[in-house]
Amino acid sequence: MDVPSGENAGLSSITLHSPPSPAPPSPAPAPPARPPAPLPPGPDAGPGVAVRAQPSPGYVGGRVVVTYTVRNGKNALATGLRLRLGLPAGIPVATLPAGCAGGVCALPDLAQGASSVLRVVLAPDRALRTNVTGTLTTTGTDADRGDNVSRIPLRILQPRIVSVPEVGKPGFVTSVRGKDFPPGVPVELTWKPGITATAPPARPIGDGSFIAQLLILVKDRTGPRTITASGPGFSPVTTDFLVVGGTITPPDEVGRR
């Protein structure tokens, strides 16, 4: 039906609004990052020391070389190495290696498999039994501290000779017997006063002993004399002998061995 235009005068317009869309939810926070796994511990160094002496036994008047060998047998650098020398108090020292003071030697760092060698020369002047030691310390790692101390026994011998018998007349051959000499070294026998007959040197056997002979020349002088044994590696040693004249028979002239 037709509505008169005048009847629309009281109508108002209505605007409809849709409700706002809900905001999207905030994303969940990311889980914290896992810390990196700890690195495995690095390898340890393995420094150790070994000591030896040559010759062993040693001999009065000779030389004994003591060798210290420090070696790193493990897989890391060995650092801060010091070696304490345990040398016998009763034996004079002829030479010390460089870098040693007060019985302690500073050593260079050693890579895996590397070694450092130190040599000490002893000059024994008396017979004795003793020990030689070496003690190693480090400021770095050490996989095995059980090889940081090395100890060896050392014996010093005093060579000596005797004549059997101790009395003889011109033309007599006396026996000279030695003990505690370096095996295999040539030992020259001489006597003074008097003339020493030419003879090959004595050679001590494995136990350091020898038996040699000295001839008293027929026209040689009588009286006391000194037999001397000398050679490399020891100080000369002596024994007394008496040359007699006339009809005196030296003891053991017939039955001596």
Q: Model-predicted segments: where are they?
A:
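Extracytoplasmic/secretory-pathway segments with low complexity and glycosylation-like composition
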Residues: M1-A23, P27, R34-V65, G73-R84, ...
